[in-house]
A protein has these predicted regions:
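N-terminal type II signal-anchor transmembrane helix
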Residues: 1-55
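Peptidoglycan glycan-strand catalytic modules in the bacterial/periplasmic cell-wall system
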Residues: 50-252, 364, 454-456, 465-469, ...
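Residue-level preference for non-acidic, small/hydrophobic
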Residues: 61, 88, 131, 177, ...
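Short pre-catalytic segments that frame enzyme active sites
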Residues: 62-73, 196, 200, 225-229, ...
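Acidic helix-start/capping segments at beta-turn-to-alpha-helix junctions
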Residues: 101-119, 129, 259-280, 317-320, ...
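Glycine-rich, acidic and aromatic/proline-enriched surface loops and short helix-turn segments
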Residues: 130-141, 183-190, 207, 211-223, ...
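Non-catalytic structural connector segments
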Residues: 254-314, 323, 327-329, 339-340, ...
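A penicillin-recognizing enzyme superfamily signal
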Residues: 315-337, 346, 359-361, 367-386, ...
Length: 687
């Protein structure tokens, strides 16, 4: 500050004081002077909440990520050491406990000292005034203009600051003001508040700061830039010792205590302890963190509120399952593979929720696109070219529910069928107006529904689709978990998937040619594992606010999407895939030998592949798909884009699932496949 202007400011304040009657003492005089400014404490809401860090944890309380605008952890007075309070008072406002917001004696002393020296050697701002200035700068300011106004060099700002400081002193105790000040101010290196500063520089708490540590932090408030101990260690050390001297002068320390503290080195950490804001810091849980933020936003708690609110979000993520899921997808797919990735989601059905316990992608969650990193929601948004034959389970479920087929009934398996009224095209040489389907590979001419679910021929499921109707099958798919298919615009920005499928009577629906949300696919698995009951997938166990109040959003009611007996029959019927079906090799490779309900899926031309599976306590789905700018056929070993595709759901997708299941099944129980009510075993004939 130019010394002339500084002197003018101080003189201006004193002139205002001097023009008032002397009767009533200095306090009355300063209060009258301050009354020339119209603002009062209510105009800035000094009782407003400070911006605090919000924390996202896994289900065990381990921190996944933090979100903040200002990195601040607020603590109560009894969690701030008396030593740091004494240090701040000694160096910044030694008459703090005697004045009433504005220190007239200190102002006169500063004026005399500065005019005598010809420079600004002493300030005149009390801790109350500093609190007001910092509050206006860090809390009240909404834009650069407000921030400039909070720091401008003007008589008006100084008078306003004085008025508000007096109001502050009228409304709060000295300890409340000092605690607010220590929780508010910046200590540099992104640390706001004394608790954050203690963690940043010393990896300790505000309650446990030593005398030397407290003195260093108290001294830094004067100029965090010029007293940064990492950039200007000598200046920081000198300032710390000045604070120690001030503590002796004010009676807070004995000379011997001062000497002992002054003999200590700076003692700061080798580097300041920082905590990045956002999901990038969540590492392998980055995609899950992104999903949590999206879920919270959908449930009324947006990211902007999280960045200031000081919330604690305890999520459903199970660290052991997450570790296994991440390791499995990284084993099966390279993080930097061109144009293709592998996602995996796992859900644990509970009494009243479907808890997302793991979410993994072969991609790294990050901003380095050249290294294959991305922040796109690859694990929880509709993408790719579909889950393929996984969708056959919807036809099987509806046919079982309608009594059109039993698990042990015999289905005819023609190599090729042509059907009218279910779309055009399909296999080569399809007649005009006909939908033509062929099997991929060679099959017996007949087999049971169990065998068909395990080995996945195409033609019998198209015939089942004809019998029960496309409309009912797509409605069941939505009820079981593909809820986004019913959302307006989900197909082309204007029409929903459901509307388009029904309007065209899309025969190919049961062959899974449509983009799918990997998380929704996993929730279909969870609904079947949960005896046909759908619950919205949830990533959150609890949300508490800064005061510890539970504000957890209601995740909604569960629904019986499919009759319990039908769901159990289907789960039983899906038990052959890992034993003698398309997932047999993958299960064996992972040393999995227990019961599991499963279904593989591969789309036309091997553009994507999926796997869905579940045991009673854990359900999941994996999905390999084109995630780049071009759509190409996919190959296995390694997973990659290629000219002639040979990827199937029983390859990388199934292997990733079974590897994860082998590592984690003990955490979720297991047991035999569900029993089947006799009415779902045989109907006598396929009707």
């Amino acid at each position: 500050m130019p010394r002339l202007l500084s002197a003018v400011l101080l003189i201006a304040v004193l002139i205002v004081v001097a023009t008032l009657p002397l009767v009533g003492a200095a306090t009355f005089a300063t209060r009258s002077a301050a009354d020339t400014v119209n603002d009062d404490l209510g105009d800035i809401d000094a009782n407003a909440s400070l911006p605090l860090v919000s924390t996202i944890t896994d289900r065990n309380g381990n921190v996944l990520a933090r979100l903040y605008d200002q990195r601040r952890y607020q603590v109560a007075s009894d969690r701030i050491s008396d030593t740091v309070k004494d240090a701040v008072v000694a160096i910044e406002d030694r008459r703090f406990y005697d004045h009433e917001g504005v220190d007239v004696r200190g102002t006169l002393r500063a004026l005399l000292a500065n005019l005598t020296s010809g420079d600004v050697e002493q300030g005149a701002s009390t801790l109350d005034q500093q609190y007001i200035k910092n509050y206006l700068l860090f809390i009240d300011a909404e834009d650069d203009a407000d921030r400039d106004a909070a720091t401008e060099t003007s008589i008006a700002r100084k008078l306003r600051e004085m008025k508000l400081a007096i109001d502050l002193d009228r409304n709060y105790t000295k300890d409340e003001i000092l605690t607010r000040y220590l929780n508010l101010v910046s200590f540099g290196n992104g640390a706001y508040g004394i608790e954050t500063a203690a963690r940043t520089y010393f990896d300790t708490s505000a309650a446990d700061l030593t005398v030397a540590q407290a003195a260093l932090l108290a001294g830094m408030v004067q100029s965090t830039a010029n007293l940064d101990p990492y950039i200007y260690p000598d200046a920081a050390l000198a300032r710390r010792n000045t604070v120690l001297d001030a503590m002796v002068d004010t009676g807070y320390l004995s000379p011997a205590e001062r000497d002992a503290a002054a003999a200590e080195p700076l003692g700061v950490l080798e580097e300041p302890r920082t905590e990045p804001s956002g999901c990038i810091s969540a590492g392998d849980a980055g995609f899950f963190c992104d999903y949590v933020l999206s879920w919270l936003d959908d449930n009324g708690l947006d990211t902007a509120e999280l960045a200031t609110g000081g919330y604690t979000v305890k999520t459903t993520l199970d660290p052991a399952t997450q570790e296994a899921a991440v390791a499995a997808v990284h084993t099966e797919a390279a993080a930097d593979a061109d144009g293709v990735s592998l996602s995996a989601n796992y859900i644990a059905p509970t009494d009243n929720a479907h808890e997302v316990v793991a979410m993994a992608s072969s991609r790294i969650y990050g901003l380095d696109a050249d290294a294959g990193q991305t922040v796109l929601p690859l694990t929880h948004s509709a993408l790719g070219n579909g889950a393929g034959s996984v969708f056959k389970l919807f036809a099987a479920a509806q046919a079982l529910a309608d009594g059109k087929v039993g698990l042990d009934d015999t289905l005819q398996v023609p190599q090729r069928i042509e059907v009218a009224g279910m779309g055009d095209g399909g296999a080569e040489n399809s007649p005009v107006g006909m939908y033509c389907v062929e099997n991929s590979g060679t099959y017996s001419s007949s087999m049971t529904l169990r065998e068909a679910l395990a080995t996945s021929p195409n033609t019998p499921f198209i015939e089942l689709e004809q019998k029960v109707g496309v409309d009912r099958i797509v409605d069941l798919a939505v009820r079981l978990g593909l809820r986004s298919y019913a959302e307006p615009g989900s197909f082309d920005g204007e029409n929903s998937v459901v509307d388009v499928v029904k309007a065209s009577n899309m025969g190919s629906f049961v062959l899974g040619p449509l983009a799918v949300d990997p998380l929704e696919l996993a929730n279909v698995s969870a609904s079947l594992a949960d005896n046909g009951r759908w619950c919205a997938p949830t990533p959150v166990l609890s949300v508490t606010d800064r005061d510890g109040r539970d504000i957890t959003p209601d995740s909604g009611d569960c629904e019986q999407a499919l009759d319990r007996k039908v769901a159990n029959a289907l789960a039983n019927g899906m038990g052959g895939d890992a034993v003698s079906g398309t997932a047999e090799d993958a299960a064996r490779a992972a040393s999995w030998s227990g019961p599991v309900s499963a279904k593989t899926g591969t789309t036309e031309s091997n553009l994507s592949a999926a796997f869905l599976g579940f045991i009673p306590g854990l359900a999941g789905a994996t999905y390999a798909f084109n995630d780049g700018g071009s759509v190409q056929q996919l190959c296995t070993g390694p997973l990659r884009q290629c000219g002639t595709g040979n990827l199937f759901g029983g390859n990388e997708p199934a292997r990733a699932f079974f590897t994860t299941l082998t590592a984690t099944a003990g955490r979720y129980g297991g047991g035999k496949l569900p029993d089947v009510d006799s009415q779902y075993l045989r109907t006598g004939t396929v009707r």
